[in-house]
Every structure is written in structure tokens, then in C-alpha cells.
Amino acid sequence: MTAEISQAVRIAASMAAASLALASSVAAGAEGVAWGGFAQSHVVARTSRVDCPSGTACDFPAAELRGQLKAEGKNSSGDAAFLARLDLLRDVAVDDTRLVTRELFGDLTSEKASARLGRQVMTWGVGDLLFINDTFPKDWVAFFTGQPMQYLKLGSDALKLNAFPGPANFELVIAGFRPDNTPTSRRFIFADPLPAGLPRRTLEPGNDSGEVEISGRISGYLHNWELAGYVSRTHYRSPAWRVAGAEIVGTYPRLNTAGASLTGPVGKGVLSIEAGYYDSPQDRNGRDPSIENPQFRGLVGYSRQLWEDATLGLQFYGEWMRDYAAYRETLPAGFPVKDRLRKVATVRFTQFFAHQTAIFNLFAFVGLSEEDRYVIPSLRYAFSDNLWAEAGANLLGGKRNGMFGSLQDNSNVYLTVRYAF
């Protein structure tokens, strides 16, 4: 049995060939393949004059042209399908040209089950830009530079199995490791407490049976409430850095999580609750300062319509560090001190105008314990069904030892224009 699981893992960890073969077989029997895509321009300008280190894109952290080609199809019976999204981008701000496989997967479905193999984007949990049981990879560079929200999530090379035999739905994901895309000095300015001048390298987990990532979810409805339970055996997706001789090495420690969520109507709005426990099996006593201390995380959110075409959403989020005394004892000099209980509140206000062709959106993070903030206003206008433009900002501030305050020199404004075909 173990050998069979290991083999399935290796297949799921290197999806491109298998997905392409499955997609090709589906396309061969498809009644027709639907083609689409878009062309997009995205320019980001820093809001203040700052002294940038050598090698950092300073005045314009991003200046990107991107084209996406999408193809999808299914066979005549509808029980097999495929989807592919390929992006070609050129960012002159950092001299980067790449062909990116955003998604590439094949689907097989039946009345009581389905399977998806390939690169796919997955979203779990009920938080609005707050993630507890969603441990899948994310692109924080795209987020902090104002890319369309679809680019916050990165695709996982995975095998996803769904079963819906009755009132409960079951989902199992077997995936290879993929790290978050985290801010670096290529585009961002931030304090670095690690020694300067030492070379850095990261060691990513392998895809053998000991390093595979497995996540599961069970969900269902009780009256008008949706309930879900989650478990995962994954990795932290940001590197844990430590000095090793004459270099700095980043690893991705193991992460085990378990949690639950529920959402349903309360009054004239919707209440959302989610909680989870983050276990660091490589440092359960909290004495390795490079590995995140085990934590309890939770959020409560409420959203409702204020008036026609206007909605308001509020959230309160907390992280409670389990072994705080060990964390304080082993924290290296020069590193900012975290509170045992980190508290964050969020607010989202959305207003539609002009028959919903214009959308004003305001999202704000407020660090209640770290005394910092991150405000994201945006205005989008659809000139037609195919063409839209969005202007917005990423405004960070507050105390510099906070998550958002430490990035305040990276506040920016952006303009995105997209034509879809």
C-alpha cells in the first residue's frame, strides 16, 4: 500500500506530461475546443522617493505586459474535460521574460466522484484575504503590487479526488511542494536582520513519499449552515533562514494543520467562523527561532448589504503562539519581537455604479497588536464586455516592526488594463 501511495505521489508531483496526455486524449474526443484569453498591461509606481539598494526596481517595481491563452473542452458524454491557461509575460522593470503554466489539468467525473490531475488552483476556508486552513501556495509579490486577485493563488501540481456519496462531500489532495512567491529585494525594500554579504540558497523538499503533501476536507450543510473540517500535512511555504557556516540556507519545515469552519445567515448578513491549529513537528517545543512556533489561529467575519449595490464586510483574526517563553528565550538579537497574541481586523467596502460597469472597492488590514496597516483602494471600469481598466493603490504604514509596517517603503499605485478575447 505504501509503495502504491508513493507512486501516486510521484505522478502528482510532476504533472506536466501526464496532464498534457490526459488533456490531449480528451481534446481528441471533444466536440469542440473553446479558445480564449486576454492581453494585459500592468504598471506599478512607488508613492514616495526612497533610497533603493542596488539591484532593486525602485521608482517602478513592476511594468508588465502579459498575454494569456486559454483552451478548454470536454468529450461528448461530458465525463472528461480539460483546461489549460498559459501566460507569456515581459516585465521590463526587472528584465524578466517568462512562459508560465497557470493551469493545466484533466478532469474525469461520474455521478458520485471526480478526479482532477495536473496544475490547478485550489481555495479552502471562509476568510476574505485571511487564510487559515488554506495552506496552498500563494504569490505575495503579485498581491503587494496590485495584480488582479486571480494571481494571488498559485497552481499546485496535484491529484485531487472528490467523492460526494450523500450529505457530505470528501476531498483529498495529493500534491508536490511549491513555495510561496515572497517579496525579495528585486522589487521590495525591507529590513533584513540576517548578516549581510553572505550568499543565500534554498533547499526545497523533495517529492518522495516522505515529503509529499496531503490535504483533506469534509464539508456539508446543516440546515442553512455550511460546515467543513480540514487536515493537512504540508510545509511552511516561506523559507526558514539560518546561518550555516559561510552561507545562509533557507529550508521549508514541515507543517501539520487541523481545523474547521462554518458559515451561514445571521440577521441580514452572513457570519463566517474559521479556526485551525498549526503544528511544527520539527520544533514542537518552540526553541528553534527559524521555525514558526506552533499556533492556534482563528477568525470571525460578518458581511451584509448596506444598500443597493453596496456591501460591507468585517473580520477579526488572531494568532496565539503556544510556547511564547521558549520563543523569547531563543530569539536572536536584532530580530523584531512578536506579541504572543497577534490581532488583525479587516474591513471591505464595495460599491457598484453605472449599472455595475464601475466598481469601487476598499479593503483594509489593521494590525491591532502590531499597530500597522495596509489599505487597498481600487476603482475598476468596464468599457465593454471585453475591455476594463483598474486604478488602485497598496498603502502600507505604521510601526516598522509589524508585518505591514515593515513594508511601508513599498507603498505604490498601479494601473491595469485588460482586453479579453
Model-derived regions: residue spans:
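Residue-level signature of outer-membrane beta-barrel architecture
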Residues: 33, 71-75, 107-110, 119, ...
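Transmembrane beta-barrel strands of outer-membrane/channel proteins
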Residues: 37-45, 84-88, 117-119, 172-176, ...
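Outer membrane beta-barrel
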Residues: 72-190, 223, 398
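Outer-membrane beta-barrel "beta-signal"
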Residues: 349, 395, 407-421
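Detector for outer-membrane/organellar transmembrane beta-barrel domains
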Residues: 232, 263-285, 289-365
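Repeated loop/turn-to-beta-strand initiation elements of outer-membrane beta-barrel proteins
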Residues: 33, 77-82, 112-115, 167-170, ...
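Hydrophobic, lipid-facing positions within transmembrane beta-strands of outer-membrane proteins
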Residues: 63-69, 101-104, 155-159, 212-216, ...
